[in-house]
Swiss-Prot record:
Originating gene: snr-6
Matching SMART domains: Sm (SM00651)
Pfam families, per database record: LSM
Species: Caenorhabditis elegans
Known function: Plays a role in pre-mRNA splicing as a core component of the spliceosomal U1, U2, U4 and U5 small nuclear ribonucleoproteins (snRNPs), the building blocks of the spliceosome.
Localization per record: Nucleus; Cytoplasm, Cytosol
Complexes and interactors: Core component of the spliceosomal U1, U2, U4 and U5 small nuclear ribonucleoproteins (snRNPs), the building blocks of the spliceosome.
Keyword tags: Cytoplasm, mRNA processing, mRNA splicing, Nucleus, Ribonucleoprotein, RNA-binding, Spliceosome
The protein, known as: Probable small nuclear ribonucleoprotein E
Database matches in Gene3D superfamilies: 2.30.30.100
Sm domain segment(s): 14-89
Statement: the UniProt record of this protein carries the keyword Cytoplasm: yes
Amino acid sequence: MSTRKLNKVMVQPVNLIFRYLQNRTRVQIWLYEDVTHRLEGYIIGFDEFMNVVFDEAEEVNMKTKGRNKIGRILLKGDNITLIHAAQQEA
């Protein structure tokens, strides 16, 4: 058995969002009061209030799986519940 100590490192939310921005990772954002829709696109800017500038944004209907291209948008941080890397489409 190994005697190595496992170090747990806390990742700050701003660092993760910045990594998504730097790596141009396609992300999905869950909306606060609308569970039937999510937004997918690329983060190209954000601020300390988690207001996000989103490029190539698409609105995804979770019931029908339909997609609506909406382009570049500014999403207020108050509307964001969760941000994660979007799954690659097959």
